[in-house]
Amino acid sequence: AALAAQLGTTQAGTDHIGQITRVLNARLGTGWYETKEMPNDPPTPAQRDLLWHDIVFDIDRNYPLVANIVAPPGNQPPGYPPGQTIYHYFTVFGYDAVDRTVLIADPASFGGNQIYWLSFDQLASLIPPKGYSA
């Protein structure tokens, strides 16, 4: 409840990734996290490159990323309700540079899937038009 209050979360959710960035920095006593917007859908090559760079750079330094996603029918992580668009946040806390996949911790646990791998391409397609904290 205290974290939700700090985030300004209501029954309608948490409005903007910037709220996550602010609370992460306050709770960790750091200025590490920045809000990265991804307004273009599909994302530009530069936005995709920055996202991959942020994943590798941050995770290698023990800073997971938080992504604000929009998951419409046909482009959803495992277990998501198939007939609806889900607006959600999850954490990116690992990656595989060879396979270009990312490890997700998902607090919703749709279908019992709390930890799972996504392709980088799918992650990059889920974030627009929102953003992420890195």
Regions found by a protein language model. Give the residues of each.
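Conserved active-site-adjacent core of cysteine acyl-enzyme catalytic domains
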Residues: 2-134
